[in-house]
Amino acid sequence: MTSPASPSSTAEPTPDPDRPTEPGPAALFDAIVAEHAAIYGYGLVSPHVMPDDNELVSKALAEHRDRREAAVALLDERSVKVPLPAVGYQLPIVVDSPSSAAKLAVQMESDCAVAWRAVLEQTDIEQDRSFGGTALTQCAVMAARWRRVLGAWPVTEAFPGGSE
């Protein structure tokens, strides 16, 4: 997972004091954090993919940006403070080849799917549930496209965003 970078390798990131305490808004807040991380991560994926996959990077980046902005608007409508992007992120792997770039893309899509599934599980607001379902589906489809780039099988997951 791409996570906010900490000052030392043993320190855990400090929880955001602006994170809502209610489960629904908190899950949406966390999904925005995941979207920020994915946007950052695709900036590292882009220079390492094969030229044939540049369009996939562009599409993924546009989806994450659009999704983040729409989710920010949902929190804004409720006067909930939105998370800011971290100044840097700790990557789960070194990205130095087309293969490692695609693996990071799969991981980021999976991380976002987990976050959007949590929105579905935690909120009772119909607008958020609908948005979360669409977001989860988009992340699952994008992860499948990246798994295909890797030649992985199967390319899909039965229950995206979960450990089933």
Regions found by a protein language model. Give the residues of each.
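All-alpha RGS (Regulator of G-protein Signaling) helical domain and cognate RGS-like helical scaffolds
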Residues: 1-164
